[in-house]
Regions:
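Residue-level signal for inorganic ion chemistry
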Residues: 86, 159, 185, 280, ...
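Amphipathic alpha-helical segments within well-ordered protein domains
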Residues: 72, 160, 220, 281, ...
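Inter-helical turn/loop segments and adjacent helix faces that build the functional surface
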Residues: 93-102, 162-174, 189-206, 220-236, ...
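A non-catalytic, amphipathic alpha-helix used as a structural packing/dimerization or gating element
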Residues: 44-47, 51, 174, 206-213, ...
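Conserved N-terminal diphosphate/IPP-binding helix and adjacent helical/loop segment
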Residues: 1-118, 122, 126-141, 177, ...
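Divalent-cation-assisted or electrostatically stabilized phosphate/pyrophosphate-binding catalytic cores
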Residues: 133-155, 196-211, 234-238, 260-286, ...
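Active-site alpha-helical segments that house and flank conserved acidic catalytic motifs
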Residues: 105-130, 180-181, 212-216, 220-223, ...
Length: 371
């Protein structure tokens, strides 16, 4: 039902939080001081990353000029290139892949997962109506929604082409399965928007589908191309799963506590769009009157549907402030640490050395990153 008075931020008093509900902190295994330097962690695979970058930036000379420009801007905007880096590192765990004919297939895999990731971002921006990403205008800000979707489709096609270049049917099937999983996750997210009584399991299913599945494709696909034993292929799949789950959890934490300028969006952007993430679930679990929080949000959303978006924004702003002041963020970060400890454990059966150390260092980087 409609509410008669605007819902102000103070509707979420911090005194209602249970101050005793703080999790025990599980620290990651200490790493050398340089382990958090991503450039140092990528050093063993730098030549391979350059090859991936060259492949990503290749533009068909016959391509429609505006699409070619958009393609160059999307790929040229860079990013951490974590997905291809994980593929390259995983492929080298058994030693001696660089310089072999099979290494070109690993390069193609790395380009494939990165291009697939980029394509999903383009479509996400259309679905969310986002005009900015990391503070820069999205393709959606310049083109119509239809044109942007078509551009994303082109990227999907390019990713599929790269996958085919591996000439490995198991990897090609993995690419197809991953794409289907991503779409399933996107549909789940759309269905659960503004559903404030959904289960936390919905969140885990969603972030596996939209994020972790791509990391799984990178590490499992690389293990297949490296011809590792099935047990080790399974280990690297699990590594990708645990790494990817933690990566998205930290992303969702940063959405609440990160610097607006660095992230290029206001705090609580996911919640403002009706997407519930792990910090919110912990906030709700720790709140002594969770039902009142849900009632406030549901009423504010009704007001927004009736044209009064200010009520919704005020409600979310108040919740974000209260969430930051409590222990929900640390509880979510603890879950990320647990996933990353599992990821490190997944590497125990693989040869020790530079590549494994880089994978372990990336786990430490993920839990501490601020962007």
């Amino acid at each position: 039902m409609l509410i008669s008075q605007p819902i102000m931020p103070q509707s979420f008093p911090s005194k209602l939080m249970d101050a005793t509900a703080r999790p025990n902190v599980v620290e990651m295994t200490p790493q050398p001081s340089g382990a958090l330097d991503v450039n140092a962690l990528f050093a063993p695979i730098r030549p391979g990353l350059r090859q991936v970058e060259a492949k990503l930036c290749g533009v068909d000379s016959a391509l429609f000029a505006p699409l070619a420009d958009a393609f160059i801007n999307l790929i040229g905007s860079g990013g951490k290139r974590l997905r291809p880096a994980l593929a390259l590192l995983a492929a080298e765990l058994n030693g001696g892949m660089q310089g072999t004919p099979r290494y070109s297939a690993v390069i193609a895999l790395g380009a494939s997962v990165e291009m697939l990731h980029t394509a999903t971002l383009v479509h996400d921006d259309v679905i969310d109506g986002s005009l900015l990403r990391r503070g820069a205008p999205t393709l959606n800000a310049h083109w119509s929604g239809v044109s942007t979707v078509l551009a994303g489709n082109y990227l999907f096609g390019t990713a599929a082409r790269f996958s085919a270049e591996t000439q490995n049917m198991r990897v090609i099937e993995l690419f197809s399965d991953t794409l289907r999983t991503i779409v399933d996750g996107e549909l789940r997210q759309l269905k659960d928007r503004y559903n404030f009584v959904q289960k936390k399991d919905n969140y885990y299913q969603r972030i596996y589908a939209k994020t972790a599945s791509l990391f799984c494709a990178a590490t499992q696909g690389a293990a297949v191309l490296a011809r590792l034993p099935e047990e080790r292929i399974a280990d690297l799949y699990q590594f990708g799963y645990n790494f990817g789950m933690a990566f998205q959890i930290v992303d969702d934490i940063l959405d609440f506590v990160g610097d607006d300028t660095t992230l290029g969006k206001p705090a609580g952007s996911d919640l403002r769009q009706g997407t519930l993430t792990l910090p919110f679930f912990h906030y709700l679990h720790q709140h002594v009157d969770a039902s009142s929080v849900i009632a406030i949000l549901e009423a504010a959303q009704i007001e927004a549907d009736n044209g009064d978006g200010a009520v919704w924004n005020e409600a979310v702003t108040g919740l974000v402030q209260d969430l930051r002041a409590g222990s929900a963020v640390e509880a979510a970060r603890e879950e990320a640490r647990i996933f990353l400890r599992r990821a490190v454990d997944n590497l125990a059966g693989l040869p020790d050395g530079l590549y494994r150390h880089s994978l372990q260092g990336l786990c430490e980087f993920v839990v501490r990153r601020t962007y």
